[in-house]
Amino acid sequence: MLSLAVLVSGGGTNLQAIIDAIENKFIKDAKVDLVISSSESAYAIERAKKHGIKTETIVPKSFSSKEDYDKALFECLSKAKPDLIVLAGFLTAIPAKIIAGFRGKIINIHPSLIPSFCGKGYYGIHVHEAALKRG
């Protein structure tokens, strides 16, 4: 069975879609074992808890340095040993150490063409509004 760690920052609609797809057997032989949120107020945490999924909250601003945050996130993922890390609306940059340490095991769900519509402010409906505005 494929072990998934899903990283989130907000409402968790992508997380819910993954959970539903697993429960409906659209995604087979996979299980979300861990949800990590970069925000204490992310509704995604509640979605995970409703399905009995372990959650961790690792808020970048609660660390004295970027290096300390990077280390905490890396250690959390290393302990979980996921087969796949899914960035599902995760609004924090992924540290190079994680990219190197989990090479070939990270996918990003992003709702638009990168790099044209990414970065600060490009989340949720805002991505689509910007794309439509540009034409």
Model-identified regions with their sequence ranges:
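One-carbon transfer enzymes
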Residues: M1-G135
